[in-house]
Curated annotation (Swiss-Prot):
Domain SH2: 478-569
Alphabetically ordered keywords of this record: Phosphoprotein, SH2 domain
Residue positions, PTM Phosphotyrosine: 316-317, 395
Protein name (Swiss-Prot/TrEMBL): SHC-transforming protein 2
Amino acid sequence: MTQGPGGRAAPEPEAPTTFCALLPRMPQWKFAAPGSFLGRGPAATRVAGVAEAQPEPGVPALAAVLGACEPRCAAPCPLPALGRCRGSGTRGARVTPDVADEWVRKGGFIHKPAHGWLHPDARVLGPGVSYIVRYMGCIEVLRSMRSLDFNTRTQVTREAINRLHEAVPGVRGSWKKKAPNKALASILGKSNLRFAGMSISVNISVDGLNLSVPATRQIIANHHMQSISFASGGDTDMTDYVAYVAKDPINQRACHILECCEGLAQSVISTVGQAFELRFKQYLHSPPKAVVPPERLTGLEELAWGDDDAAADHNYYNSIPGKEPPLGGLVDSRLAVTQPCALATLGGLGQGMTPVWRDARGLPWDMGPSGAAPPGDGYVQADARGPHDYEEHLYVNTQGLDAVELEDTAEAPLQFEDSPKKDLFDMRPFEDALKLHACSVAAGITAASPPLEDQWPSPPTRRAPIAPTEEQLRQEPWYHGRMSRRAAEKLLRADGDFLVRDSVTNPGQYVLTGMHAGQPKHLLLVDPEGVVRTKDVLFESISHLIDYHLKNGLPIVAAESELHLRGVVSREP
């Protein structure tokens, strides 16, 4: 230590410290900047004053507010002042236990600039600090930055700059062209050059980084602070560039490159560091509350497959003394409940009107004065949708059913409440009636004509579904009657073992349970139309389906998987 002219000890020169050393306890958040951060000295204030300067008369408001070192700005960066600020360096600080505790308790950086941050905390906590930079595009990052060491992360950002520097025309930043790094070919993916080469505004605050077009205020990207995993800028070999890796819904995980005028990159990366420190302090003051998972989530197997007998654990209103039943009574699971606003509209039309509920096809169902829908009988009917199977998402051969239902919903027109009680889901009589009615009006037919419903053609005959009976299935050794999913899986020992059971949650729905590649599979055997079928073949009955695949040694193919039937799991006598 040497005494200065004013009796004050002059600081000892130290080697530059990378920004990553400031975050020893946050491995997923690292910054790289070998020079020191700009302090709040007079020189540094003049450099960064563009973000805090008051608008002068005659100077465009945009340049005064966003003030940065884009060549079109009114005042360029004072390079001598920037050099003095860089030369001043950051006062060294040893990592002692007290300083480490300071980071944990208050969220302060260990190697914080001696003169403080570049901007007031209130500015970063509030509207943020804006800079005018040139956006160079982004490159997809295929691997998580947490899985890479710090040197590899730095190489990723430099390789991204190296690729975009050649692809984007009109770049002015200082960059030495390097040979492509083949070792990073598996980490970096495709590039996105949309908005590349445009002058944009980057706003930095505790909320994150917001990239927008200054003239039109169009948002290019908005990266929250917690989505940014790495930032680097202002190094000796990338003095004019800032690179950061963040995730967003458009580009997924990508490395975004910003080109700054000379000296501005250090200001940008310093402001990002300040925003991160303030955000971390906010986290320390109000950490998120621990969420206790429900007991049902304790077992992954239970979550994945569900429990058919879970309904027995619920407390129903008719088993609790004094408990009133819910309003509305039983609601058929085939009916889609309308929005409350729809019922309010009906109520406004007349106080004496009966609520009408419509199913997925838009057909009316009279609920009656009590609002109770007719309960389903639990079996699949010929011309109506069967009750919703709550295990449907757990089966491997039901992926195409939702698409068929959506098609039918989109194509089926709306019927009126006074429609004849014919085939409800046959739309052709309704269409024919509309055509006949239009012709009648055009021809001037009077009310003496026969009733309209008598002129409707009869619905076409449709093949009745094959509904297997309990007596027929009881004759087969592989049929076990009503059985839960878990109980059926316990009976399977080897690949090819199979049985057929009646669903517990949806009586009348028959399920084939078998073992394939050590995993149990569950296939629905009767489709919503009541037909026994596989993906490509229709069968006369469940027994026909089982015998066909068992005798011919053919697998049942469903949802890109197959199930072989080799060993019959016989039911207990």
